[in-house]
């Protein structure tokens, strides 16, 4: 099997941060500029941006060649699992009791599990999940701080940028981590 040269962990984190940060900025622009009326429709439109664009952007980090569509569909599935858990807890807890944090915890655990299954990685779930959760949470809550401080359109866009940079860094690391066993197996 011919594979693409594997990206380093640093490159994966930086590439994930930049690419997912830009996608997140675009997604949060829907909220920032009030482009879609109604809460359910707005969240659906934001999720659609992530579902459609993220897999295409992060595909560059996959080592298997010619997997653009397959990876994009896989990523959409993994992101959908995350989004379902996040929305379920956020809406059920009505924005209280750290529903966003609990939703992220469960959603990112599901995403990590799906990535490990897809890439055949059988070890290091806790490490991979912990790093993803940490980067995501730092980005999300730093973005929230910016929104609290600046408010309005600027605050919303900054929230999107910070959330995307943090989440993207975690996703870049997750892809690097999950592909390590595959790289080791192929290079033997």
Feature names for model-found ranges:
Residues 1-188:
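Juxtamembrane/disordered regions of integral membrane proteins
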